[in-house]
């Protein structure tokens, strides 16, 4: 830690989902990580102890609700309750990856809206603010009745690709839902966009990938918010090459990379996969064509600005 933050009432706590990111954020802010322990009883119940006074402090909890999702959610809820009962002044949840975000609406009858339920649980536990990164659905902000700052990963990804000095690029959205995200990256890189339109011509027939936009002879950059099993992104990359793209890069904010994702990426035409560290990944998933960027500086700056009651809006771009 190279600098010391002046206000001792700012406390940053780490739980178990991403301790390396939490330590990086604390170092950038200029504070020591708050003293707490997260353990399990013999039956698996979560036990949290806060090992310093936080009375009257502004507390920030760094916790991605990634795999194991439900374990990390329970840790977070119990930590919020512990801070509330210890008389914290404010309890700010920093969620680099918001689990259950894809369950943001009723796609079919009798389905839950679990993204809303999670928001309710955080508020009921005692959270006073949320700092989130690249929510799968922006409308999740409306699920909260407390302030929420929604940061974007596109500037981080865009800065990386600017530094590569790639020529004749095109930004590609792998589906209709990601067009806005692709447009933001395209505007930053001053590049055109293309869209992959997946259609099933008739029942029981495989989907056909139609590419809307010119990708012939260009370097394509696929962008998504989440790469989970990597089926969509790898099929899209293969379709781009088959239709004349010179080479394909892929990027996302949240590398869930579950199931066959790593194998699919290794077997695909993707030259490089660029992600952030919003989710902690085991070493076996850090494959050769994998580049991980840090969201630590962005989240640290957001924490400082929230604590000092400064504007956070410029971080959105």
UniProtKB/Swiss-Prot annotation:
List residues binding Mg(2+) 2: 175
Q: What does UniProt give as GO cellular component?
A: cytoplasm; ribose phosphate diphosphokinase complex
Per UniProt, what does mutating residue 204 to A do?
A: 4.5-fold decrease in the affinity binding for ATP. Slight decrease of the Vmax value
Residues annotated as binding ATP: 43-45, 102-103
Q: In which pathway does it act?
A: Metabolic intermediate biosynthesis; 5-phospho-alpha-D-ribose 1-diphosphate biosynthesis; 5-phospho-alpha-D-ribose 1-diphosphate from D-ribose 5-phosphate (route I): step 1/1
Cysteine pairs forming cystine bridges in this chain are none
Record bears the keyword Metal-binding: yes
Binding sites annotated in the UniProt record for ADP: 106, 110, 141, 149-150, 311-313
Using the UniProt record, give the first listed, main subcellular location.
cytoplasm
Tell me what effect the entry lists for residue 198 to A.
Strong decrease of the Vmax value compared to that of the wild-type. The affinity binding for ATP and Rib-5-P are slightly altered compared to the wild-type. The cooperativity of ADP binding is reduced
Instruction: Look up what happens after changing residue 202 to A.
Output: 3-fold decrease in the affinity binding for ATP. Slight decrease of the Vmax value
Q: How is the cofactor bound?
A: Binds 2 Mg(2+) ions per subunit. Each Mg(2+) binds only one residue (His-136 and Asp-175, respectively) of this protein, however the magnesium ions also bind substrates and water molecules to complete their coordination spheres. Can also use Mn(2+) and Cd(2+) ions, but the activity is less than that obtained with Mg(2+) ions.
The organism's place on the tree of life at top rank: Bacteria
Q: Which residues form the active site?
A: 198
Q: Which GO terms describe its biological process?
A: 5-phosphoribose 1-diphosphate biosynthetic process; purine nucleotide biosynthetic process; ribonucleoside monophosphate biosynthetic process
Question: What this chain does, per the record?
Answer: Involved in the biosynthesis of the central metabolite phospho-alpha-D-ribosyl-1-pyrophosphate (PRPP) via the transfer of pyrophosphoryl group from ATP to 1-hydroxyl of ribose-5-phosphate (Rib-5-P).
Supply any other comment: This enzyme uses a steady state ordered mechanism, where Mg(2+) binds first, followed by Mg-ATP and lastly, ribose 5-phosphate.
Q: What is this protein called?
A: Ribose-phosphate pyrophosphokinase
Naturally occurring in which organism (per UniProt): Bacillus subtilis (strain 168)
Point out the gene that encodes the protein: prs
